[in-house]
Amino acid sequence: MSEISAKHISDVIGLLNDNADYAVLRNFEGLPDNNKSRDIDIIITRKSYVALKSELLKLIDSSGWKIITYLHSDRLITYVCGFSCGEHIELVQWDFFFNTSVWGILLMDASEFVQHRQFNGFLYYMEVEYQFLDKYLYNRAVGSQFPDKYAWMREKASQNLVVKQKIKAVFRVNSIEECDNIDSHILVMRAIAANYLQRPLDSIGNVLLFLWTFIRNYICSNTGFSIGFTGPD
């Protein structure tokens, strides 16, 4: 990674450190000098993001970087930032997640993540069990199994009490193994029930927000589609 990208990452992380309840979800070990994948996944409370958005945009613009792709969905805001270096373009993608959810159905909110974040001297990050929960809850809800390439993560997190309690609260199962063998439609219905029992008004609002952003981004938009290739996350 170039010094230009490393400085850009350092500047944005510095802003987040000073102003936001956030954490980097994964692939944070080499930052800012070594970014394992072009995109950097941030879990952040919606309140924190709204409060620092204008400062973030000012920082990006004042440093010579340009936002070349922008996506705003119900659970995620993406900035693909580019910097022209003559014959090539430096790219850094920031993915700001407000929660782990599917179709507006909340599985785990950012506030649940960031209250357990750790600091390594440069950035806030999530421990393995929370990295696992983010991926596992989402994958099972959409009908996918946990990726084999993250088997090491599953092995480390599967017996963790926090993991067991969260999966039980969302999907009403007693173990990961049980969850693996239940149809995703049943898991989603259980997640919906858990949401409406705990926070009925918020649950309705989340689904409406999903529908509104989906229609705006993919049905009413006339900007077309783009295909991007990123590294492992």
Predicted features and spans:
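Hydrophobic anchor at the beta1->P-loop junction of P-loop NTPases
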Residues: I227-F229
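Conserved NTP-donor binding/palm subdomain of two-metal-ion nucleotidyltransferases/polymerases, i.e.
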Residues: M1-I40, I44-F225
